């Protein structure tokens, strides 16, 4: 294959840093010792047939995220269904109903159970089918695989085997964990994006072994064979130990040769690799856990309620069986007319114990209506409908990507309303991975007039808040005017948007910088931007402009900015970079060559990057950019001329949420450079464990006596609405933790951008402190970390300022120790006391462990949100997992419970849908238990009234229809349509969310209250009916009512009472609820009428009962009215007194809206909105509150000074 054009572009190994330099195989580097447990994997390269039999047969590349398969669906799903207490009880009841002891027809017990369980299993099947189809899509992706004939043909991912040679092309994802053999570049270099693994968008450089570089075309693979001996599958993303046996030599392998599944090939036309790990053996899948079957807290509490009712059921059944035994022993001899012709043990007075035991089974079945069999299926239906509302909410539809919100499981809808802590990924979740060059400081002058997103949003919020507080006098400019000024600032001049460049300032554009003072410094600033990097230019033939593939988006934005300023980096060779420089107003450019002598790369430890170049005049320059704290401490005495104003500008940029770097340079003479370069070359070609440390020490020798030129300010573009969303969630009382694989500096900058951090907030950084030159032992490190945590806890507790806010920042290495058993709860205690928590450089496994710690340590509901494969473990570990369905992969979405297109939609998902779903489900369940207790206990009272005979007062069909038809639809409507307040009010009053977080509507106080209401209703329904009807003339002819007439009258009262009760419960009526509530009552009368018209062989004692017996009797209608009113009167009185004496927040809002006070009295409405904010220390609101306190402090100080001055002025005549 022709490779000349690609080879001529770059020989990267000559210009890359010591981190990219590769010792030759003959330089004596020893292979890794591969032996012992954990190092048993053997891979035969290009010989996949060797892996078809054990022990070399490894897992296939098929990946599954489903909970069930064809074999396990029925047993596993049935287990899940009968794991529920109520379903298990009704399974036992259905089995017992087959025997003659049952007081009901067997189908009246079996049919509802089959319907309920079948519907739930169908829902589970449909949801798992959705996961299966997404798996099919991923597994059906194709990649080129080498065949024995030397050709590469496309094959599905799932059919790839260990040992296969695959070819991955540019912008393709790696289908498995591969060993890089060669790339389209002759140096075997390729760029990889690992955002799906560690969240970082910075491109990583991978490089093959020198010995495999010749494998560069199809023919070269015909006879290629080799053996890889390496570590077993493990979750560590950043380590790999192995050896390659090739051409009778052994070559050591390290992570720089490994291409991980779900990472993406960038800036490289193609690579060849051999498959080492497949499917669930890959590191990304090792970092994920099996998709768990999650249950909400409310559902778990519901089980305890059912256990309580089961205890009540067993108690009254024992009372009933004891009563029956008593009646059998002492009264059965007198009741000769009840004895059967053939004696039975059941009625034998000489054996009452046996009679009582047998009757116990009858009683357990008879009183089973205390347990609501339709509760689970009704909740399933309601949750599915709630989920459909989430899916169809246009306010959570992203028009740009065309992606709506999606509830991938409906089991956790109500959990959305009870979240305490949100654990969020950063890259791709909070940010859009887009850096814009926005401002800069050069030679002590700040340039760039556009405002950052943070400044604009904060100014708008401050304008609103200051207006509400009435803080600004009419003589000064209004906050709204100030906000308008900032908005105008942010959109000065309409121009074609340029990716990576949001700068606007006429002083530097179009060559105007030549008129500025300090032109030499400005020229140096631009040259540092254009030269100090490792990027590769690519010409866009359509636009004629260059784009840049860089290791970091910051670097790409610097080059774009330099290009817009007139310094276009357009070419790189193995030893030089070329820049077109515009040095005049005419627009003409000069091509200049800068020879790259050395490049000292950026690392998280160094926090800086330098390049040593020789310009065309022969001058040697060290150009350096890095963190301001690092650069400032390396400045020469004469290099601090601009230190003061630059520091001031950096603070301003930081307050604006911008990422900053300081730029500096140093001139080197030939002699000094030559001496240093000899040492540097010696260090970078050395082989040993201390190589990196040696290189750092030698780099420090040259990176000193720097001269400060200026600083850059780059905006890490947040996703649209992120700061506002975080602010609203904070007002709702939610805590937010950020878990990211990024560097600490990057994470801190994002924290400022989205107002998780702010100026004045005290930062607690927990890090591992190593001794110079030597690593500490594990115990010393643990003691050090524990000491840091203990001191931080004391500092937080001793803080007396109520407005003080703390932010905890910890890196992944330190977190490894902090999550160990002896320390994790101290760490958690510190973290929960901090306003915000940021964990940096964390692995996917650590994300999951932190989530587990918060979930189990606090006992509160956690929500994890992320967009990449590196977030899967965290998403699955949390009580609720939310996936961002971005452009990079679907792993997070596939593992999630809910998916949204943008982070900002989380606000509506929680504050609106979460609040509604929690309240709906809570009220629905409480009502369900109320109506079943009210109904079920009447059976017990009738039993006691009739000598515990085991006879039901209600017809079998009444019992069958009560839960399934006559009372199910109104309660489903309650669970689907109920709204205490509208969605707009939920967003305006975010503190309403605290009702769910505090579980106000499903605590035991409220549950027992509803159960007590059910007991009261049952007493009224039975005894008031008996009092009205018993021994009274029921018909005109003077006849009394029989059992069926009494039972039908009582059942009518129950239908009326429970439906009127639900009508009083509803806050938001729709026509559907009216139809279902009053229609259920009408349906009852229709059923009784039609059922009574059937032949007596079918209707039995119900024959024409409504038409001929009940309807003509006035006492029937009087009893219905009196019983219904008496039943609901206490609840009506309760809700009335509560609204008058102890109203809840939503009661006040409902009243304000009903009387339209929000329109007539805006000041009261604003005051109520302000009160409805949860006191928070993060977000725009906290930032604005801090600003208001600052303004008040300044005003009070000014008034105090004026008062003192006035006092001195009045006293001065006396002193004369």
Swiss-Prot record:
Q: Give GO BP annotations, semicolon-separated.
A: phospholipid transport; protein localization involved in auxin polar transport
Q: Any idea where this protein resides?
A: Membrane
Question: Which portions of the chain have biased composition (kind: Polar residues)?
Answer: 1198-1216
Q: Which residues lie on this side of the membrane: Extracellular?
A: 97-100, 328-359, 943-956, 1030-1042, 1093-1109
**What domain of life does the UniProt record list for this protein's source?**
Eukaryota
Residues crossing the lipid bilayer are 75-96, 101-123, 306-327, 360-377, 923-942, 957-976, 1007-1029, 1043-1065, 1072-1092, 1110-1134
Q: Ranges in the Cytoplasmic compartment?
A: 1-74, 124-305, 378-922, 977-1006, 1066-1071, 1135-1216
Q: Can you name a GO cellular component term?
A: plasma membrane
- Catalytic site positions: 425
Topological type in the membrane: Multi-pass membrane protein
Please tell me which positions the record assigns to the cross-link Glycyl lysine isopeptide (Lys-Gly) (interchain with G-Cter in ubiquitin).
Answer: 605
Q: Drop me one GO molecular function for this one.
A: ATPase-coupled intramembrane lipid transporter activity
EC number, as in UniProt:
7.6.2.1
Where is it mostly found? membrane
The UniProt catalytic activity note for this protein reads: ATP + H2O + phospholipidSide 1 = ADP + phosphate + phospholipidSide 2
Keyword terms, alphabetized: ATP-binding, Isopeptide bond, Magnesium, Membrane, Metal-binding, Nucleotide-binding, Translocase, Transmembrane, Transmembrane helix, Ubl conjugation
Residue span of region Disordered:
1195-1216
Look up keyword Iron-sulfur and say if it applies: no
Q: Where does Mg(2+) bind?
A: 867, 871
Stored PROSITE patterns? ATPASE_E1_E2
PANTHER family xref list:
PHOSPHOLIPID-TRANSPORTING ATPASE 4-RELATED, PROBABLE PHOSPHOLIPID-TRANSPORTING ATPASE
- Functional summary from the UniProt entry: Involved in transport of phospholipids.
The UniProt family comment states:
Belongs to the cation transport ATPase (P-type) (TC 3.A.3) family. Type IV subfamily.
Protein name per its UniProtKB record: Probable phospholipid-transporting ATPase 4
Q: What is the lineage of its organism?
A: Eukaryota, Viridiplantae, Streptophyta, Embryophyta, Tracheophyta
């Amino acid at each position: 294959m022709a490779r000349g054009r690609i080879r001529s572009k770059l020989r990267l190994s000559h210009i890359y840093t010591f981190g990219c330099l590769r010792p030759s195989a003959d330089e004596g580097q020893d292979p890794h010792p591969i032996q012992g447990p954990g190092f048993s994997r053997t891979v035969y390269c290009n010989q996949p047939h060797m892996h078809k039999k054990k022990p070399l047969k490894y897992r296939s590349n098929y990946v599954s995220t489903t909970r069930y398969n064809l074999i396990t669906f029925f047993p596993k799903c049935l287990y899940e269904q009968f794991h529920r207490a109520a379903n298990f009880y009704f399974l036992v009841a259905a089995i017992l109903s087959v025997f003659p002891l049952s007081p009901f027809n067997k189908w009246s017990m079996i049919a509802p159970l089959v319907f309920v369980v079948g519907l739930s299993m169908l829902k589970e099947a449909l949801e798992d089918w959705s996961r299966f189809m997404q798996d099919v899509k991923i597994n059906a992706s194709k990649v080129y695989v080498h065949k024995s004939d030397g050709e590469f043909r496309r094959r599905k991912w799932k059919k790839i085997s260990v040992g296969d040679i695959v070819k991955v092309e540019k912008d393709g994802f790696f289908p498995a964990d591969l060993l890089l053999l060669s790339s389209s570049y002759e140096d075997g270099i390729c760029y990889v994006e690992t955002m799906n693994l560690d969240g970082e968008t910075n491109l990583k450089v991978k490089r093959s072994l020198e010995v495999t570089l010749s494998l560069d075309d199809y023919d070269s693979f015909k006879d290629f064979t080799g053996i890889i001996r390496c570590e077993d599958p493990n979750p560590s993303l950043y380590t790999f130990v192995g050896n390659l046996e090739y051409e009778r030599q052994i070559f050591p392998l390290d992570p720089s040769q490994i291409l991980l599944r779900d990472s993406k090939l960038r800036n490289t036309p193609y690579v060849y690799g051999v498959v080492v790990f497949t499917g669930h053996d890959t590191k990304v899948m090792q970092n994920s856990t099996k998709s768990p079957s999650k249950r909400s807290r409310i559902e778990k509490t519901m089980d305890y309620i059912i256990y309580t009712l089961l205890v009540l059921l067993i108690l009254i059944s024992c009372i009933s069986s004891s009563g029956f035994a008593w009646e059998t022993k002492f009264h059965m001899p007198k009741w000769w007319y009840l004895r059967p012709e053939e004696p039975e043990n059941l009625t034998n007075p000489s054996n009452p114990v046996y009679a009582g035991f047998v009757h116990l089974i009858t009683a357990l079945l008879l009183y089973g209506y205390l347990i609501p069999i339709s509760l689970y299926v009704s909740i399933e239906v309601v949750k599915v409908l709630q989920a459909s509302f989430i899916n169809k909410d246009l306010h959570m539809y992203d028009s740009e990507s065309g992606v709506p919100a999606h509830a991938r499981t409906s089991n956790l809808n109500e959990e959305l309303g009870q979240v305490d802590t949100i654990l969020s990924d950063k890259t791709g979740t909070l940010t859009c991975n887009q850096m814009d060059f926005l401002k800069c400081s050069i030679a002590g002058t700040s340039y760039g007039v556009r405002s950052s997103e943070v400044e604009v949003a904060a100014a708008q919020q401050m304008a609103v808040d200051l207006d509400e507080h009435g803080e600004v006098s009419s003589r000064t400019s209004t906050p709204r005017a100030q906000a308008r000024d900032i908005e105008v600032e942010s959109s000065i001049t309409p121009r074609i948007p340029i990716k990576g460049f949001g700068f606007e300032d006429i002083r530097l554009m179009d060559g105007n910088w030549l008129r500025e003072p300090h032109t030499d410094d400005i020229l140096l600033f631009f040259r540092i931007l254009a030269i100090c990097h490792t990027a590769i230019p690519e010409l866009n033939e359509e636009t004629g402009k260059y784009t840049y593939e860089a290791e970091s988006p910051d670097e790409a934005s610097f080059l774009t900015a330099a290009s817009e300023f007139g310094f276009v980096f357009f070419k790189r060779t193995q030893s030089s970079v070329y820049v077109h420089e515009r040095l005049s107003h005419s627009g003409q450019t000069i091509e200049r060559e800068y020879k790259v002598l050395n490049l000292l790369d950026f690392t998280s430890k160094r926090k800086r990057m330098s390049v040593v170049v020789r310009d065309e005049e022969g001058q040697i320059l060290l150009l350096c950019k890095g963190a301001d704290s690092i650069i400032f401490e390396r400045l020469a005495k004469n290099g601090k001329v601009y230190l003061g104003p630059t520091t001031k500008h950096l603070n301003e940029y930081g307050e604006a949420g911008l990422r900053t770097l300081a730029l500096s340079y140093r001139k080197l003479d030939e002699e000094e450079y030559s001496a240093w370069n000899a040492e540097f070359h010696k260090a970078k070609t050395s082989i040993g464990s201390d190589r990196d440390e040696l290189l750092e020490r030698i780099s420090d020798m040259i990176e000193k006596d720097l001269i400060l030129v200026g600083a850059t300010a780059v905006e890490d573009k947040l996703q649209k609405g992120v700061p506002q969303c975080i602010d609203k969630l904070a007002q709702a009382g939610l805590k937010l933790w950020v878990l990211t694989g990024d560097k600490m500096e990057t994470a801190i900058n994002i924290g400022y951008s989205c107002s998780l951090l702010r100026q004045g907030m005290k930062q607690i950084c927990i890090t591992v402190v190593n001794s110079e030159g030597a690593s500490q032992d594990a115990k010393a490190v643990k003691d050090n970390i524990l000491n840091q945590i203990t001191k931080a806890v004391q500092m937080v507790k001793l803080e007396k300022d109520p407005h003080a806010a703390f932010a905890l920042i910890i890196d992944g290495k330190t977190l490894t120790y902090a999550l160990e058993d002896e320390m994790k709860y101290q760490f958690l205690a510190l973290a929960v006391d901090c306003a915000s928590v940021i964990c940096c450089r964390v692995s996917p496994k650590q994300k999951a462990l932190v989530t587990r710690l918060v979930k189990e340590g606090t006992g509160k509901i956690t929500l994890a949100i992320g967009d990449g494969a590196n977030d899967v473990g965290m998403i699955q570990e949390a009580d609720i997992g939310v996936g961002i369905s971005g452009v990079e992969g679907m792993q997070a979405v596939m593992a999630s419970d809910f998916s949204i297109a943008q982070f900002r939609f989380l606000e509506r998902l929680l504050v609106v849908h979460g609040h509604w779903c929690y309240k709906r489900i809570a009220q629905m369940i409480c009502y369900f238990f109320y109506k079943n207790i009210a109904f079920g206990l009447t059976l017990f009272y009738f039993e006691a009234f009739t000598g515990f005979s085991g006879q039901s007062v209600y017809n079998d069909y009444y019992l069958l229809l009560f839960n399934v038809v006559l009372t199910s639809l109104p309660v489903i409507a309650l669970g689907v349509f109920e709204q205490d307040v509208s969605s707009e009010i939920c967003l305006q009053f975010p503190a309403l969310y605290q009702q769910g977080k505090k579980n106000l509507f499903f605590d035991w106080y409220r549950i027992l209250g509803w159960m007590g209401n059910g007991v009261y209703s049952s007493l009224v329904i039975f005894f008031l009916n008996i009092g009205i009807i018993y021994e009274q003339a029921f018909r005109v002819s003077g006849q009394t009512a029989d059992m069926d007439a009494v039972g039908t009258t009582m059942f009518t009262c129950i239908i009326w009472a429970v439906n009127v009760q639900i009508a009083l419960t509803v806050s938001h009526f729709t026509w559907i609820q009216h139809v279902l509530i009053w229609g259920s009552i009408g349906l009852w009368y229709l059923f009784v009428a039609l059922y009574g018209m059937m032949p007596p062989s079918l209707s039995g004692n119900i024959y024409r009962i409504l038409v001929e017996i009940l309807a003509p009797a006035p006492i029937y209608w009087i009893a219905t009215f009196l019983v219904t009113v008496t039943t609901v009167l206490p609840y009506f009185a309760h809700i009335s007194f509560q609204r008058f004496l102890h109203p809840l927040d939503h009661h006040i809002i409902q009243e304000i809206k009903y009387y339209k006070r929000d329109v007539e009295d805006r000041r009261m409405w604003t005051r109520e909105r302000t009160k409805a904010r949860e006191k928070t220390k993060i977000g725009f609101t906290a930032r604005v509150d801090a600003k208001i306190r600052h303004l008040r402090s300044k005003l009070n100080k000014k008034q105090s000074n004026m008062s003192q001055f006035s006092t001195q002025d009045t006293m001065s005549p006396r002193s004369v």
